[in-house]
């Protein structure tokens, strides 16, 4: 479904341990799943407000890394109630029949310093397709509740 291309994933994750690889759980306060779609002669922007996910990240060997996300399809928000209702309908996400969207990585490849390609399976409306998501590693640092990483 071209509707989600390009999908922009921005996430910050709380670090549970210092050993590699490290699994980061989504911190929804500092994370977002947003999209930008061409509509007629303009762009429509939106986001999903309810999601969960994790990234297993190995900075020394990114091939050992993985990503998983689950998104509640009914949480779509474009700041237009009529459009949101249409997107939730059978015409698009059919949220009553398909309450979640998901992504599960198959492979993570380094594209150079702080750049990754994450190849995986995106499932929308029960249809699974291979997609590649470009990811930028923003860094790892100290946060108010311990170590955090940004992607």
Stretches with model-predicted labels:
Residues 18-151:
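Low-complexity, acidic/polar, glycine-enriched regions of mature
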Residues 14-16:
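N-terminal signal peptide c-region/cleavage motif recognized by signal peptidases
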Residues 2-9:
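Sec-dependent signal peptide recognition
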């Amino acid at each position: 479904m071209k509707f989600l291309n390009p999908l922009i994933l921005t996430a910050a994750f709380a670090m549970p341990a210092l050993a590699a690889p490290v699994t980061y759980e989504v911190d929804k306060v500092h994370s977002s799943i947003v999209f930008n779609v061409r509509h007629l002669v303009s762009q429509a922007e939106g986001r999903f407000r309810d999601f969960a996910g994790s990234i297993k990240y190995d900075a020394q060997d990114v091939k050992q890394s993985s990503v998983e996300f689950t998104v509640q399809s009914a949480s779509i928000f474009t700041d237009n109630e009529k459009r949101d209702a249409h997107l939730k309908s059978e015409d698009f996400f059919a949220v009553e029949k398909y309450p979640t969207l998901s992504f599960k990585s198959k492979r993570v490849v380094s594209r150079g310093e702080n750049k990754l390609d994450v190849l995986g399976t995106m499932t929308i409306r029960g249809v699974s397709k291979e997609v590649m998501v470009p990811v930028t590693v923003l860094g790892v640092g100290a946060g108010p509740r311990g170590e955090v990483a940004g992607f």
